[in-house]
Amino acid sequence: MTKSNISKDNGPLDEVEGIKERSNFLRGTIAEGLEDRITGAISDEDNKLLKFHGSYQQDDRDLRDERRRKKLEPAYQFMIRVRTPGGVTTPEQWLVMDDLAHKYANGSMRLTTRQTFQLHGIVKWDLKKTMQGMNQALMTTIAACGDINRNVMCNVNPEQSDVHAEVYEWSKKVSDHLLPETNAYHEIWLEDKKIVDSREESEPIYGSTYLPRKFKIGIAVPPSNDIDIYSQDLGFIAIVEEGKLLGFNVAVGGGMGMTHGDTNTYPQISRVIGFCVPEKVTEVAEKVVTIQRDFGNRSNRKNARFKYTIDSRGIDWFIDELNERLGWELEGKRHYEFDSNGDSYGWIEGKDYWHLTLFIQNGRIKDVEDYPLMTGLREIAKVHTGDFRLTPNQNLIIANVSSDNKKQINDLVEKFNLTEGKTYSGLRRNSMACVAFPTCGLAMAESERYLPELLDKIEVILDESGLREEEIVIRMSGCPNGCSRPALAEIAFIGKAPGKYNMYLGGSFNGSRLNKLYKENIGEEEILNTLRPIFIDFAKDKQKDEHFGDFVIRAGYVEEVKSGLDFHSSKEDVRS
């Protein structure tokens, strides 16, 4: 294994650190910017602070050239992301989100890879009304983005209802414990009473500059790794024996993002360092976060994530630092096994209720011709007495359906032609894409709008090879930030330019291994021509129960990646 080249020494602070320091606990001049009717945008500094409030300024990239020719400013709009720990929401909240999507956004909702909602296409003048509408439904967007702990993920786990309920409660406790304490959110969006003297405020966990970069936490319940535990900055793996939650293994230092061409950036898988009882979870989470607060790189944001803090100083250093802050040591890690990181579709019977998992292609909730998905889910929400669970794979579980109500829900599913994905290929059922164009400002290539079209063509090859039902994890990301967690997929495409992608192979079916670059900067024709012989080879030579990601390593298409430090190929290894 190679060693990290990242320096432990901090240089001059990145400009974002100054913005946070002088923001008066995330207020900045956001309130004034919202009132400025001259432009549909806010200032650059406020845009960096707005993330902490759960929103990003964007523009419609499909319209950029046209508006530039007309000497108009970009078609500025905003994305709002909700904070929903564990992805659990009520039917009433679903209906509110549906209404806000039509009233203020682009008429659609996006289920994200971190189990929450995003609304796109909101203009500046409607931001506050949208936030207030969410708040009235007991939803918030605070800390859904920004250099802070983000939405805490939790295994949806309909098969083990009692365990899920207990683990879900811990995800909420961790989420609540790590919320910022500033009153800025309530002052700006909910028009609460302003604090006259900001010296009355403090952030005991974060401090006035919060974290160096985003921080992500998730809780998994084996054997399902649907939350991709190894991608999290901090992960808790539930240890369950005879239906009883004993505690959690603690995993640290995962993360997906990187920068094209910079080998000092890379995806990384987390490492399991020990075990704690449930009552210690929030304490462990807080101490881990404070270590990143104090030692994370605040000079170079490309190397500011927690994985680089650990890799530059060493896992042994981190464990010593954590033990010192805790005042006690984690117990030895307990045995666990994951079998997959996907979803189980269709009806599943729990202890007292039924749960229905629907396939939502790339998480987009909208009505299209012959598929009134948004309308169908709206009608279900009107009669559903349980809850909705947003899965980490961008799908939706209609959960806690009573036996008496099951037929009514099923009739609505059939009436609106909603799908469990059973007729789709195993590849499509395990597919995932980020939003990318036209709203994401970081996108280098299409993702959500293109992956379904590419899958249509790949499925032709699967049919030819007899692999249509083979479960294979495939993911696409429009840029190397990796919101769809592509580095853990058996097949992944990461955008480099419009129509061009890096192709990666060799992730594991259960999400425990990174993939490896196989071809660089290729378009659709080469993608299909590359996959065809590999699929044929797989169909012919796969061993019993062997998954595609394991096969391509055994067959020599790519080398196994055991750590993010070994992720980048040398030039002679790359096929171009």
Swiss-Prot record:
Residues binding siroheme: C483
Pfam families reported in the protein's UniProt record: NIR_SIR, NIR_SIR_ferr
Assembly and partners are described as: Alpha(8)-beta(8). The alpha component is a flavoprotein, the beta component is a hemoprotein.
Check the record and name the SUPFAM superfamilies matching this protein: Nitrite and sulphite reductase 4Fe-4S domain-like, Nitrite/Sulfite reductase N-terminal domain-like
Q: What protein name is recorded for this chain?
A: Sulfite reductase [NADPH] hemoprotein beta-component
Gene Ontology BP annotations? cysteine biosynthetic process; hydrogen sulfide biosynthetic process; sulfate assimilation
This entry's Gene Ontology molecular function terms read:
4 iron, 4 sulfur cluster binding; heme binding; metal ion binding; NADP binding; sulfite reductase (ferredoxin) activity; sulfite reductase (NADPH) activity
